[in-house]
């Protein structure tokens, strides 16, 4: 899942909900990867401070390149939009949602979609 900024209110809230429900995601055989344009050093401190045990990836340099490839880089703000992509074991995109920078996603949607995939 892409998120705009580490340590921001909405991003931290979204990731903390997923942290607290991580057991449910792993029970559904899902792996969570979270990515923003923050540096790996920021990501490390953010993960330690919030107790995240899932990987936080840094799309730092070239700046936003991964987000650009997914078509969700906001060139004006210089960050990724809130994009979530569920990819199956074969690398096939099964579901996605993209929200604006200020708009939090509903984690229940992830649970519902993952429960329907084989």
Predicted segment positions?
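Chalcogenol-based redox active-site neighborhoods
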Residues: 1-118
């Amino acid at each position: 899942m892409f998120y705009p900024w580490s340590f921001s209110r909405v991003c931290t809230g979204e990731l903390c909900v997923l942290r607290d429900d991580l057991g449910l995601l792993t029970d559904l055989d899902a792996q969570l990867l979270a990515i923003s344009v923050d540096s790996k050093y920021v990501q490390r401190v953010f993960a330690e401070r919030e107790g995240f045990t899932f990987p936080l990836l840094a799309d730092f340099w070239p700046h936003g390149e991964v987000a650009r490839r997914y078509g969700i880089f906001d060139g004006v703000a210089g960050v990724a939009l809130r994009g979530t992509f569920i990819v199956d074991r074969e690398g096939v995109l099964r579901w996605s949602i993209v929200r604006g920078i200020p708009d939090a996603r509903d984690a229940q949607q992830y649970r519902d979609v993952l429960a329907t995939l084989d």
